[in-house]
Amino acid sequence: MVKNKNVLISVFDKTNLDNIAIFLIKKKFTIYSTGGSSEYLKKIHVPHIQISKYTEQKEILSGRVKTLHPKIFGGILATYSKKHQKELSEEKIINFDLLIVNLYPFEETVKKSKKTDEIIEMIDIGGHSLIRAAVKNYRKTTIIIDPVSYTHLRAHETSG
């Protein structure tokens, strides 16, 4: 079971996002979300906090930079040691113990498009970085990268 109730959602593939988001709200999670994910959650009336509101930094460069921020990566990479938690508190950083992240469809775009600019925009930077940070801190941070795994998350959270 996830110890902390803050989840970061940053997905390109929104398959079943409505169901898992509603489930997380019912389980008393606070959802933080980026760009298109935030727009989607707003459209389906799921309460959440835009990540740019939390970081106090708007998305820049046409959305190329959304999650690359110490308030996000600090919350993912911190352990529950007193030292880390003190530092988070001093910097007003929350713990993220659950991430729901999937990547831009780079390979599909390469197969379908001959336009270099279109292909380049599908090179995911922030998503890969979020995944790597969560993996580095695997003892604390749970990451879901495929909508198929939402059922596993539901089962895990329901059993606790």
Residue ranges and their predicted role:
Residues 18-21, 62-68, 129-133:
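Short, flexible, solvent-exposed loop/turn segments with mixed acidic/basic and small polar residues
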Residues 36-106:
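Glycine-rich nucleotide/cofactor/substrate-binding loop typically near the N-terminus or early
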Residues 70, 76-79, 90-145:
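Divalent-metal (Mg2+/Mn2+/Ca2+)-assisted nucleotide/phosphate chemistry catalytic cores
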Residues 151-158:
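Conserved small/polar residues in nucleotide/adenosyl-binding loops
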